[in-house]
Amino acid sequence: QKEVRRLILTCSGGPFFGMTREELAGKTKDDALKHPNWKMGPKITVDCATLMNKGLEVIEAMRLYGLPLEQVTAIIHRQSVIHSLVEFVDGAVMAQLGVPDMRIPIGLAMTYPARLHNPAPALDLLACGNLNFAEIDEAAFPCFALAKQAARIGGTACAAMNAANEAAVARY
């Protein structure tokens, strides 16, 4: 942990990437369920559209690795090729890359340090093209900012925020 400068999680930005808060006002449930890169259930797809999923993942990473919020962040990566990165104190960055298929990072998390066969296709680096990144617009995606605020508060704030999100998505 003392060798880690920061942990960087990535997200695609969902179907609403690049929109302002005003543009998001009229979006429907059907709009939220049109994820550009992943096929998932409706609850997680809505969480991806609001970036609440990334806020929850930041909290999870903090707790899993014992890192403060200042060392865990998230950025937008539309191609969904890079799933996460670790920046070390010497400036080196290690990234977990793969095709946009969650079986790869989930399998890695569940079997590490072992390496088991995964049916997901291999990543063709030459076919990837450019890999682009953007900052998360917390004004347009206040759920991400809310999750970070809950992480700062600590205690039961994260659980309360998660419960409120569950109820809100169920009503959406």
Where do the language-model regions lie?
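Catalytic, metal-anchored helix/loop core of enzyme active sites in primary metabolism
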Residues: 1-172
